[in-house]
Design a protein with these regions (language model features):
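A structural-propensity feature for long, helix-poor, extended segments
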Residues: 110-131
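Catalytic-pocket segment enriched in acidic/His residues
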Residues: 2-7, 68, 85, 115, ...
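RNA pseudouridine synthases
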Residues: 127-129, 133-135, 140-149
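Short loop segments at secondary-structure junctions
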Residues: 105, 135-138, 149, 180-183, ...
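Structural signature of FAD isoalloxazine-binding scaffolds in flavoprotein oxidoreductases
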Residues: 93-110, 124-126, 251-262
Length: 272
């Protein structure tokens, strides 16, 4: 499930003052890549190959890649959406999606360092997830990868999880969007994998989601309008550090790598 010949749309940082620019990625390696500068991110309609050929080419380094959508209006996250993860967390299979929100300030680039204040780092955890990016008219524009970074001690202070899911610049998001016209991770049975310092922790097909992406779009649309660029983060499979015996939380210097077949991978090092 290579993405080499599949359109990939990302966002790069042009400078340190928060200037962003969407690009169509044409090549990429660990060091960086090249892409075509776009006037706007293609949430609404696809860019043709003829249009891309006429656009200026830009080179970029890996650390210039920002959150694939830098400032989404809404980010809905889903908890407890894989049966094995539900079991390891000790919950029954839900009748309806368990939803919480993440703010845009919690997003990080796909290769950014994640800085966790020492007083907030006691139970830092990873959650590899498939993320959905919305287009127009309630349609899914494409798919990407997210680490729903979690602070378990804060998450479980109350029955509401928000305070354990929104640390500033903590959730790696990217590296790019693969359009739904070219790739369906559910139909393809794409496998999500998470490694911590090279050790495989999560490995599961996203086809096993209890509530599939379109189910989530339909459910959320009952009470909220989904606009182009809004994000739905679909949940994590079993293998999180909190569910291990004993729990294995993230520590200073740990590298979390998350990959989904047919989309790409993100890598974030923890600094606490």
């Amino acid at each position: 499930m290579s993405t080499q010949n599949t359109p990939r749309f990302a966002t790069i940082r042009l400078n340190d003052r928060g200037a962003w620019r969407p690009i169509a990625v044409t090549s990429f390696s660990e060091e960086g890549g090249e892409g075509k500068l776009l006037a706007e991110f293609p949430y609404k309609e696809q860019v043709t190959s003829t249009e891309l050929d006429s656009l200026p080419t830009v080179s970029f380094t890996a650390d210039q890649l920002g959150p694939v959508v830098p400032n989404p209006g809404k980010i809905f996250c889903v908890g407890l959406n894989y049966r094995e993860h539900i079991a390891e967390m000790g919950h029954p299979i839900p009748d309806h999606p368990t939803l919480f929100v993440k703010y845009a300030s919690a997003l990080a680039g796909p290769f950014d360092e994640v800085v966790v204040p020492p007083e907030l780092s006691a139970q830092a955890d990873y959650e590899g997830e498939l993320a959905v990016i919305m287009g127009e008219f309630g349609q899914i524009a494409g798919y990407t990868v997210m680490n729903d970074f979690s602070q378990r001690d804060w998450q479980y202070r109350t029955q509401q999880w928000l305070q354990g899911k929104n640390l500033d610049r903590s959730s790696g998001f990217g590296p790019w969007m693969v359009p739904t016209e070219h790739f369906d991770p559910i139909a393809e049975g794409a496998v999500l994998r998470t490694w911590v310092n090279g050790e495989l922790r999560q490995e599961h097909s996203v086809a096993d989601l209890v509530f599939k992406p379109q189910d989530l779009v339909d459910y959320i649309s009952n009470f909220a309008s989904l606009a182009p660029g809004d994000v739905i983060v679909t949940g994590t499979p079993e293998g999180v550090g909190h569910g291990m015996t004993p729990p294995q939380y993230l520590a200073d210097g740990d590298e979390v790598r998350i990959a989904i077949d047919g989309i790409g991978e993100i890598r974030n090092r923890i600094n606490c």
